[in-house]
Amino acid sequence: LKRPHALALALLTCGALAACSGSDAAIAPENFPTWSNTQVNLVSRTTVGAGVAALTSMRADGALETVAIDLTSGKKLWAQPATMAGRLPGMGVQAPATVETAPDQGVVVALDPAKRGKWNATLMAREARTGKQLWTRPVHSTFGPQRCGKFVCMSEHTALANARMIVLDPLTGKMLWKMPGIAEVEWADDQHVVILRLAANPVVEAYKLKDGKPLWQQPVQAALGNGVDLSGGWAFGVAGDRLVGYIAPYTHPKSGKTSTFGMFSIRMNDGVIDWVRPSVVRVYPSGNPAVSPVVRPVDDEGTYGGFARLDGSTGRVMGQITATQVPGSGWWLAFPSAMNTLGFLKHNAPGTAFDLSSGQATQAKGVRSWSFCVTDPQPLGKAAAGFFSVASLCEFDLATGKRTTEPGAPPAWFTGAQNGWRLWRDEKGALHGIKDATTTLPGMYG
């Protein structure tokens, strides 16, 4: 499991952790470029490169397709059939990998349904703007391709004993190097890649991208202690020169024992552990682990504490409320865009709010907040049976618990930004974009 998304999967310990969040995002001024594309039913994250946004969409017949969209206009450039072969439902629907190969030139790499013999799918690379096929590679099983700097990384044969991670040239498909085992890319630039090795004893590792030379290794258990199990899910983000990781708890169905969990930070230049927050669970929606994580501590008896917002750079508490301040049940978390207020949203009923800096109760009146549009999401069917689409946020008036009539764009801590563009899915699956940022920022989904 990987990036759980919606309430059974995304709220990593759902029942006791029912949580949500929000923002005071204002309606965008007219001078910000903005668009909507209702031709797609977005079910994956969106990747961006060379002025193109690529995503996985679900067609009306339940089949998946890879769609490329012009980032400036929101217009669909092309669409081709897509599939998954061996990806785990808790990881969410696979997004295409988008790699920029030159200014305004890029490659979109995705899994095509074409089968041949023992191969269950075909990895296919296409020109980002035209959809022209560049190369293919047969696939038995994989969690899907990822961009790693200027290359494509993918773990293949994931269902077999000879699983390995491969690094490919995006223009030719030539294998540059490989290593045994299954890994996920957590960060890369043009020279280095940092991966999470998915194993019984997971390890964060760094390599030189051009030749695979190992740079450093750091076992996750060195940060959090023994008993880590990735089955509960995980998430990573980058704050400056630090990689911040979150490992979720997993309760074994037979033994009832809960695995080790918490957050930690690693220096990317040498792999040294920077800070650790053991035994905290991340709540949803909230910011990327490296930017504005919101967590709840859990004691040895499994009792939840209050809520705390952490500084992703240092791990320090920036604001918190105690367990005794948490109001009963039936609420969803809500935050303004600055995340300085912690709100408890009740649908169609008055909510409550706390000033995070002081921990004191504050007025809910006038607070517009964002929460999951759907609190009981249904899994996708057909080609993505058991999977959930990425979540959508809706804006609510915290004082009444009702939706607002003119919501703006969801907050940046949720959407993130890619080259200044913020992209998000509405509850019907349409993709929206606005260029109101100036840089690239990680969002809730990375």
Question: Which residues fall in each region the model found?
Answer:
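Secretory-pathway ectodomains
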Residues: 2, 10-14, 20-446
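A motif-centric signal for short, conserved binding hotspots located
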Residues: 7
